[in-house]
């Protein structure tokens, strides 16, 4: 019996192109100005200090900009980059320059499932801060109340079964009572290895898997 939904964001509830092109493009464009403006503030100092330790060398403003831009261009899932992007996106969302994209079918189904009493959690490579901003300033307004919790890669890789075991443990819900939704096969496989039910969301490609849907309207619980 399913009691909880665990959903990916990028490519699942939301357009992968919006995240990659609009949000990543915005963080890359604003990166230098943001670091320059907030260089002496504690949160940026901590990020730069951690980056220095990671690369084993002193990091000045110019180097920090180059390193983080390189991470963005190569789509490196770096925790420090995610933290920095969260701060940059916060300014963008609060100013109205950014609005979190949600597919209409995902919005309607998540709302319906919440009203039926299902627990709903998000799991993304984006930081928890970024997830809350994304859903807090979405095209449908603030929908963070749909969610009972948010998880990011501090739980581990989304392709590692242990991450899903940790999430189940953190929520105190048996893995067998979860339905995981993602557009990435390796993530689906990892969640199944952890004991979860899982469905591949294949919005842009024909479904070739048994447990596969084109959009959220096909979820029947």
Swiss-Prot record:
InterPro entries reported for this sequence: Enolase-ppase_E1 (IPR023943), HAD-like_sf (IPR036412), HAD-SF_hydro_IA (IPR006439), HAD_sf (IPR023214)
Entry keyword set: Amino-acid biosynthesis, Hydrolase, Magnesium, Metal-binding, Methionine biosynthesis
Reaction(s) the record says it catalyses: 5-methylsulfanyl-2,3-dioxopentyl phosphate + H2O = 1,2-dihydroxy-5-(methylsulfanyl)pent-1-en-3-one + phosphate
Alphabetical GO biological process terms: L-methionine salvage from methylthioadenosine
Cofactor note text: Binds 1 Mg(2+) ion per subunit.
Keyword Magnesium on entry: yes
GO molecular function: 2,3-diketo-5-methylthiopentyl-1-phosphate enolase activity; 2-hydroxy-3-keto-5-methylthiopentenyl-1-phosphate phosphatase activity; acireductone synthase activity; magnesium ion binding
The keyword Phosphoprotein belongs to this UniProt entry's keyword annotation: no
Coiled-coil region: none
Pfam families per the UniProt record, alphabetical: Hydrolase (PF00702)
Cofactor(s) needed for function: Mg(2+)
EC primary class: hydrolase
SUPFAM superfamilies in alphabetical order: HAD-like
Pathway info: Amino-acid biosynthesis; L-methionine biosynthesis via salvage pathway; L-methionine from S-methyl-5-thio-alpha-D-ribose 1-phosphate: step 3/6; Amino-acid biosynthesis; L-methionine biosynthesis via salvage pathway; L-methionine from S-methyl-5-thio-alpha-D-ribose 1-phosphate: step 4/6
Assembly: Monomer.
Annotated family: Belongs to the HAD-like hydrolase superfamily. MasA/MtnC family.
Function: Bifunctional enzyme that catalyzes the enolization of 2,3-diketo-5-methylthiopentyl-1-phosphate (DK-MTP-1-P) into the intermediate 2-hydroxy-3-keto-5-methylthiopentenyl-1-phosphate (HK-MTPenyl-1-P), which is then dephosphorylated to form the acireductone 1,2-dihydroxy-3-keto-5-methylthiopentene (DHK-MTPene).
PANTHER family per UniProt: ENOLASE-PHOSPHATASE E1
NCBIfam families per the UniProt record, alphabetical: enolase-ppase (TIGR01691), HAD-SF-IA-v1 (TIGR01549)
Name of the featured protein: Enolase-phosphatase E1
Gene behind the chain: mtnC
């Amino acid at each position: 019996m399913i009691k909880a939904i665990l959903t990916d964001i990028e490519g699942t509830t939301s357009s992968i192109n919006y995240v990659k092109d609009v949000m990543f493009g915005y963080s890359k464009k604003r990166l230098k100005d943001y670091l320059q403006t907030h260089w002496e503030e504690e949160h940026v100092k901590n990020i730069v200090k951690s980056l220095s330790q990671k690369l084993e060398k002193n990091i000045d403003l110019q180097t920090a900009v180059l390193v983080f831009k390189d991470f963005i261009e190569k789509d490196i899932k770096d925790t420090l980059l995610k933290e920095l992007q969260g701060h940059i996106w916060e300014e963008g969302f609060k100013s109205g320059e950014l609005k979190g994209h949600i597919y209409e079918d995902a919005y309607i189904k998540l709302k319906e499932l919440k009203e039926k009493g299902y627990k709903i959690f998000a799991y993304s490579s984006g930081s928890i801060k970024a997830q809350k901003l994304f859903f807090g300033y979405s095209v449908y307004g603030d929908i963070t109340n749909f969610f009972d919790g948010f998880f990011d890669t501090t739980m581990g890789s989304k392709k590692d079964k242990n991450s899903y075991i940790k999430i189940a443990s953190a929520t105190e819900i048996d893995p067998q009572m979860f339905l995981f939704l993602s557009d990435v096969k390796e993530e689906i496989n990892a969640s199944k290895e952890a004991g979860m039910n899982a469905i591949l969301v294949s919005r842009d490609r024909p479904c070739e898997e048994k447990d596969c849907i084109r959009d959220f309207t096909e979820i029947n619980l």
